[in-house]
Structure formats: structure tokens, C-alpha cells
Amino acid sequence: MKKILIKILHFIKRILTGLKNHCLPSSNPPPLLLSPYEMYVKEEIKKCYENFKPHFQKSIFLNHKDYHKFIIERAKENDEFNKKFYLEFGVWVGTTINLFSKYVNTIYGFDSFQGLKEDWQGHVLPKGSFNLNKKLPKLNNNVIPVVGWVQDTLVPFLENNKPEINFVHMDMDTYETTKFVLTKIKPYIVKNCIIAFDELYNFSGWEVGEYKALKETFNDNEYRYVCFCLNGEQAAIQII
């Protein structure tokens, strides 16, 4: 009799459990749908991967710290007499330019210190982001700041110095300003020059930013990729 009662109780329990699952709301909320922006980012990263995949096997991947060390050391290999020019566009708080300055005699940093000149389209930052209200950060002694909008300062600098440009760290973020800089400096760039982009790939809007400016200024046969940052958006090319 006891065994029969136990079977009956188990049977009733299964019925009640079934009724609960069908009639009562689930205690687990349904999975959230991706927002349009999240879907956009996901598709951008996938498209970015397919675009850069052919270059990955011919380049190296480094973490953020080693990436910056690699690009400046690679540029130094092309400057036997330490007479070539090293430029950074987009200084902001001076972190990278101070790092690069430890490897070279002089490095020039172009920045208005008033933030982005235009909206960062395809991404999340509006005009004016990174604004320091014209206040310069602490810079090493061999860092020479070129203060003002690059559209006003770059051409006079090039005309006055006739530089042999061996290294460019491009951190202007947006397409318009990056395109302006690349177009103006291209005639002064030497063979094997390293151009490092701080936001070239691996983020939403990559295709309409620095990458677009690069593709419109240089032909594919004029450069090769040498390094990608494995945990960031940075990538570097070397002029052939």
C-alpha cells in the first residue's frame, strides 16, 4: 500500500509541475533583444574582420603597450642619422607623444586642445569631445607642440621645414581631419615611414573614419600593414 501511495504522490507532483509551467509566468525573464546600436556594432566588427583578415597573417598582433613600443622602434630603424621628422596628430593629454619622445631627439605634436573639430560619425562622440580648453598637458622637453587647428598650422609647418617624415602617429579620430592631414603630408613621407592609426579598425564606424581617409589617400600598393593592436583599435602601416 505504501508503494502505491508514493507512486500516486509522484504522479500528482508531475501534474502540478506541468500546470505550473503552463499556467504560471516563468520566473526567468525572456532574453533581451539586441538594441539597434548593439546590432550595428556587432555587424561592424564582423565586416571589419572580413576586410582585414587577408592582412592579419602578414602582420603581428601586440598588446597596447608593446604596440606603441614596436611602431616607434620600427621607425627608428629607418633613421640612421637621427635627422628625420616624427609627428603626432592629436596630442590630447600627451600620453603617447611623451612615450615616443623617449626614443627620438624631437617630436612635434599637432593639436588645438579644443577637442574634435567635427562629430565622430558612425561612433559615439560629438564635436568638442576631448576639449582641454586650450590648456596644454605636461610634455617632455623634446616635445614641440604645434598649437591650433591643424587646418591652419600644418601647411606653414611643412613649407617652413620641408621635413623628411619618418613617423606619423595619427590620432585625429574623424575622417575629415585625417584626410586633410594625410593629403598634405604625403609628398613629404619617406620610404619605410611608419604611419600608425589610433582608431583604424575593430570599432563601430571604422569604415567611415581614419580607414576611409587612408584608402582615399594611398593606393593599396603604396603600403603594407605591419602591426595590429590585439586589444584595441590601433593598426600601423609601413610605406613601401
Language-model-derived ranges and their functions:
Residues 1-59:
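Membrane-proximal basic amphipathic "stem/tether" segments
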Residues 45-50, 65-71, 157-159, 201:
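A broad, low-specificity signal for short, low-complexity segments enriched in glycine/proline
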Residues 55-60, 201, 205:
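Active-site rim elements
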Residues 60-64, 89:
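Short secondary-structure transition/capping motifs
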Residues 65-83:
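Conserved alpha-helix/loop element of class I SAM-dependent methyltransferases that forms part
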Residues 80-240:
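S-adenosylmethionine/decaboxylated-SAM
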